Amino acid sequence: MAIVKVKPTSPGRRAMVKVVNKELHKGKPYAPLLDSQSSTAGRNNNGHITTRHKGGGHKHHYRVVDFRRNKDGIAAKVERLEYDPNRSANIALVLYADGERKYIIAPKGLTVGQQLMSGSEAPIRAGNTLPIRNIPVGTTIHCIEMLPGKGAQMARSAGTSAMLLAREGIYAQVRLRSGEIRRVHVECRATIGEVGNEEHSLRQIGKAGANRWRGIRPTVRGVAMNPVDHPHGGGEGKTAAGRDPVSPWGTPAKGYRTRSNKRTTSMIVQRRHKR
């Protein structure tokens, strides 16, 4: 994997920085594990915008990734590494001994031909998936389940990982990259190591059009709007907001906590916030 600064042949390419991985498969993805997906452009079933700054972008297939990793005791061989347009991490196509192929999140250091295993008897090696009950304390893990059997939900992005801190009864404590310490059931599964493509955060888009290719529309500042559109809008000429930063609906924008899921609050041992 290499970081390439593009030659400044145009203003759009002058600031562009790419992450190039020559180990990625250059052909088409594995067709049986592809699914179609349509863009909603941030609209709900009524046609109202529920997520701003979305729309356009290149069409792409969804890669069906195996987040459960529940084929216990069956060895799998890494056939190839692939780019996935739906996520920041790369994915790996693995071939199980029974002939089935699946996509998984590619951990750091994964190579073509490497053997992987799932289950409580799997060795502690990067890319193997085990119940947290069988993982040594202090191990770096990723693709962590929040409910047993539901599939990985935490630490799935490029370069992310978590650390197993302790086990107490039926729960274990995991420190996430954000600093949050969370309790998870010891029967939840996690994969050893950290997610690959860790240089993803070093790339520079270079121009606005590259974000439009990704389906990201422009973000307009509130002070540039009219009063009817945003609490910061209006004024004669170029004026300040005149109040603390808020969202278009008046919710404080800087550090205001909006989490309302009280049902799982008891699973958070330490919040990611400093205060």
From Swiss-Prot:
Q: What's a single GO CC term here?
A: large ribosomal subunit
Indicate yes or no for the key word Ribosomal protein. yes
Q: Which Gene3D superfamilies match?
A: 2.30.30.30, Nucleic acid-binding proteins (2.40.50.140), Ribosomal protein L2, domain 3 (4.10.950.10)
Query: Where along the chain is composition biased (Polar residues)?
Result: 35-49
Classification via InterPro entries? NA-bd_OB-fold, Rib_uL2_dom2, Ribosomal_uL2, Ribosomal_uL2_bac/org-type, Ribosomal_uL2_C, Ribosomal_uL2_CS, Ribosomal_uL2_dom3, Ribosomal_uL2_RNA-bd_dom
Q: Which domain of life is it from?
A: Bacteria
Stretches of Basic residues bias are at: 50-59
Residues of the region (Disordered) are 29-59, 224-275
Family, per entry: Belongs to the universal ribosomal protein uL2 family.
What this chain does, per the entry, is described as: One of the primary rRNA binding proteins. Required for association of the 30S and 50S subunits to form the 70S ribosome, for tRNA binding and peptide bond formation. It has been suggested to have peptidyltransferase activity; this is somewhat controversial. Makes several contacts with the 16S rRNA in the 70S ribosome.
- UniProt cross-references to PANTHER family, sorted A to Z: LARGE RIBOSOMAL SUBUNIT PROTEIN UL2M, RIBOSOMAL PROTEIN L2
What's this protein's name? Answer: Large ribosomal subunit protein uL2
| Encoding gene, per UniProt annotation | rplB
